[in-house]
């Protein structure tokens, strides 16, 4: 099995590509892989623009109780939010107030019919209409994460 640092580097590479493609402010992967010490309450992977606050090590929120995460688990499809201040599914207040996110895309990572984790794409410059290119990049990142998970399962 691959070590957790190696896997985290692979996750970070996927998220860096997603950050560049979408021109977002921050991308994260939260995922449960107990054998590697990964838990959804602390990002297993992250990429940020200079000046953006990292979410790594910020474990004060039980992520699975957050409304957006419950929506992902129920719907099993991406959640695209152009304006977090008026979003129908509320994002955590800290994401907006402390980390400055104003728009986001979230996509579940489903393994064996369970939501093992999710990818987040945050934009902090203002509201944003996410494009088809942006959502395709998110879908591709989920596929890349699935490929990494398949490799470490072998």
Q: Model-found features: residue ranges?
A:
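GAF sensory/regulatory domain recognition
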Residues: 16, 20, 28-60
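A short, aliphatic-rich beta-strand micro-motif
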Residues: 102-110
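Short amphipathic alpha-helical segments
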Residues: 4-20, 25, 32-35, 93
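Tryptophan-centric aromatic hotspots in well-structured domains and transmembrane helices
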Residues: 42-48, 68, 115-118, 130
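Sensory-domain boundary capping and coupling elements
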Residues: 109-123
């Amino acid at each position: 099995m691959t070590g957790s640092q190696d896997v985290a580097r692979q996750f970070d590479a996927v998220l860096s590509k997603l950050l560049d493609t979408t021109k977002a402010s921050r991308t994260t992967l939260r995922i449960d892989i107990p054998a590697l010490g990964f838990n959804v309450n602390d990002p297993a992977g992250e990429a940020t623009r200079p000046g953006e606050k990292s979410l790594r090590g910020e474990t004060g929120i039980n992520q699975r109780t957050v409304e957006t995460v419950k929506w992902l688990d129920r719907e099993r499809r991406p959640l695209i939010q152009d304006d977090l201040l008026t979003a129908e599914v509320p994002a955590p207040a800290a994401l907006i107030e402390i980390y400055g996110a104003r728009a986001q895309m979230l996509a579940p990572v489903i393994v064996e019919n369970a939501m093992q984790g999710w990818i987040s794409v945050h934009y902090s410059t203002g509201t944003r209409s996410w494009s088809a290119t942006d959502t395709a990049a998110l879908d591709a990142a989920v596929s890349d994460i699935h490929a990494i998970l398949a490799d470490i399962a072998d």
